[in-house]
């Protein structure tokens, strides 16, 4: 579309001339590029990404964690961002909006720990830890990768599942913000996710997990 072409041109100018973020925003205003993003999952109080997008003159439509996405919500949208969304996006929505990018922000270093409770499983199975941003397809957390980053934790003997979750949460927000221009202008290289890795369902969580405030080292020692 002309909107996406304009965004791509602006991104190219930014890259060539090293335009700073303030000038980037002004160029968008001058060219009157209307950008609308549908944000699924966390609300404005739970994540800073919605406020960030609005600061870039993006019109943000939101849909809560437990609400079901419908076809009409994707009209005139340039991007759908899923972060903390509780539902699998049905194939008829993806097919209806096949020219539209759907991306998911996932708290694991894909392809490891697809599905539920990725932070817990990364410790329980001693698999790579990190965050990923990937395109959404019909399979759970198996769309092509856009970005991923490994994360290491300091003072692990003092960490809980909740504290490490919070670290990953902030890292994922930072990864999105840092690469925002690439994402919105589609200036990214897709990487196919390996068939290896791991996948877990909610029901797979051990009953020994009472709450997420449990110390990781102590839990692993006793389980």
Enumerate the predicted regions with their spans.
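One-carbon transfer enzymes
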Residues: 1-223
């Amino acid at each position: 579309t002309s909107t996406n072409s304009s965004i791509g041109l602006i991104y190219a100018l930014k890259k060539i001339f090293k335009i700073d973020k303030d000038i980037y925003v002004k160029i968008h205003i001058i060219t009157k590029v209307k950008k609308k993003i549908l944000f699924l999952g966390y609300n404005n109080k739970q994540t800073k990404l919605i406020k960030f997008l609005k600061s870039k003159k993006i019109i943000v439509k939101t849909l809560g964690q437990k609400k079901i996405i419908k076809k009409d919500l994707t009209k005139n949208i340039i991007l759908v961002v899923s972060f903390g969304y509780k539902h699998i996006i049905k194939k008829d929505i993806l097919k209806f909006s096949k020219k539209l990018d759907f991306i998911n922000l996932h708290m694991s270093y894909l392809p490891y720990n697809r599905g539920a409770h990725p932070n817990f499983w990364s410790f329980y199975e001693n698999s790579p830890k990190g965050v990923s941003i990937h395109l959404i397809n019909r399979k759970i957390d198996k769309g092509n990768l856009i970005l991923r980053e490994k994360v290491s934790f300091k003072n692990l003997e003092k960490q809980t599942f909740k504290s490490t979750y919070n670290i990953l949460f902030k890292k994922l927000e930072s990864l999105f913000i840092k690469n925002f221009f690439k994402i919105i202008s589609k200036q990214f290289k897709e990487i196919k996710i390996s068939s290896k890795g791991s996948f877990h369902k909610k029901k797979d969580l051990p009953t020994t997990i009472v709450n997420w405030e449990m110390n990781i080292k102590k839990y692993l020692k006793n389980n």
